[in-house]
Amino acid sequence: MGLESEKADVQLFMDDDAYSRHSGVDFVEAEKFSASGPDRDPHRLNSHLQLGFQDVIAEPETTHSFDKVWICSHALFEISKYVLYKFLTFFLAIPLAFAAGILFAILSCLHIWIIMPFVKTCLMVLPSVQTIWKSVTDVVIAPLCTSVGRSFSSVSLQLSQD
């Protein structure tokens, strides 16, 4: 699960007429690598991270650099993105996966053994609390509010201009 059984052969294309519609880095046999292996993002959680060179760097029609500079910068962008991602995942993927596993295990344990029993207990006790609260409001708060209302209803103010 997640282990690579084949090595990916990578080629860099830098021909003048195909650079604008090509991503720069490509698999030698793209159909072999796209069809094999499980989908690592089946729910498309990281579909927003599929950025290309044109999504990051763009030159308007009025200002263009030399074609060779554009092609080389495109190739360097794609290669550095590819190599740096591989380098970072080589060093960070296992420790971060371990830390995320610990975090999710702790959160799951807290949710299962503390939060949900507390919520269920509150929901179970709630009808009793509701009955007690209704009795307290009927016995204490309702007469108090009624007497205050009657006291203030007999107050009348008259303003006179002297």
Swiss-Prot record:
Query: At what positions is Phosphotyrosine found?
Result: Y19
State the UniProt keywords alphabetically.
Cell membrane, Golgi apparatus, Membrane, Nucleus, Phosphoprotein
Q: Which residues lie within the membrane without crossing it?
A: 87-107
Disulphide bond pairs? none
Q: Name one Pfam family in it.
A: Caveolin
Per the record, the major location class is nucleus
Q: How does it assemble?
A: Monomer or homodimer. Interacts with CAV1; the interaction forms a stable heterooligomeric complex that is required for targeting to lipid rafts and for caveolae formation. Tyrosine phosphorylated forms do not form heterooligomers with the Tyr-19-phosphorylated form existing as a monomer or dimer. Interacts (tyrosine phosphorylated form) with the SH2 domain-containing proteins, RASA1, NCK1 and SRC. Interacts (tyrosine phosphorylated form) with INSR.
Q: What family does the entry list?
A: Belongs to the caveolin family.
Which protein is depicted?
Answer: Caveolin-2
